[in-house]
């Protein structure tokens, strides 16, 4: 399956690499040009046992690519994962500006059905805000395109993230669309 991951931090890099390891075609997108340049050389910005070898192996095999180009990223994946930071806001709540910015980026560029999947650590109700953002942009564009939004929180422990992803004790798929639920089940099977 063709997958795009927005964000190459801990969650995004582990998720993208592990999806590539099981045979998917993955593009990871980040705005940090230096980080993408290092990833394209096989150097990873975090320490996670086994991750660097998997990045190098899958990058060499062509199943894992890294880019700063949002056009390439949106065009590539039927599955668009949002795995960006949600730093604390002034009141301590999660600041969703990066999540909503990615939703806008996807909506501005999509030209076919997309499943937009939120992997970031976010509060309840964020999927509704992502959906509203995408609907607003599509309306501004005059585009009537189908899409679904899914909440798919991660449960990765540092030091065991690759193992946790490859053999999860649970996978949460939050969606109101049975078809989308089956697409995600197939992706994780």
Regions found by a protein language model. Give the residues of each.
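Structural/interface elements that position substrates and couple domains in central-metabolism enzymes
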Residues: 1-189
